[in-house]
Amino acid sequence: MTRGSVSKQTRNNWLIDAAVFIGAVIAAITGIYFLFLPSGGYQGGRNPMYGVTILFDRHTWDNLHTWFSVLMIVAVIVHFAIHWNWVKGMAKRMVKSITGKGVRMNRYGIFNVAIDAAVAIGFLLAAISGVYFMFAGTGRAADPLFIFSRTTWDLIHTWSGVVMIIAAVIHFAIHWRWVTKVTAKVLPSLKPGLKPTGGTTVERAGA
């Protein structure tokens, strides 16, 4: 086994994480676009930014936001399925720590889990509200009033997305060294003709 080689498991984990990352980055950028360039209004109406084109037209931005969000959701589901045992173990450890039945986590551990929880909750709310808009429509379409009004769903989608982005940036910063270490090992294995080994599995810094 050559120095710096990685296992097939590590390579596959990295590819899934890369899909999550790419989907999240594009979804975040397009989401920020709509945060500052709201979609309501009409030509000559109350929205002075209506019809403004930045790189792409609004329809293209909307498609990018929708389908890269779908990519992120699918990749996250696969990610959680693969690391479900880790998630359950960490949840049990956290509960035992809070109830005093296990080893208390240090401040760094608690902060790390809190950030992970913020990412997960923000993602879940943004994903659910995003799926709502895929089927309920936007703009002048009739409001289906499913559980909440369209305005409430929009607020949930917007601010859960903001929370998710902030928490994800912090999460990424915390695990930056791990990310660069694994990426440096995985990228060479992606070259044509090179296959991952059955050996070294790089320990994850977290789910």
Spans of model-derived segments:
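Membrane-embedded alpha-helical bundles that constitute the cytochrome b-like, heme-associated redox core
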Residues: 1-207
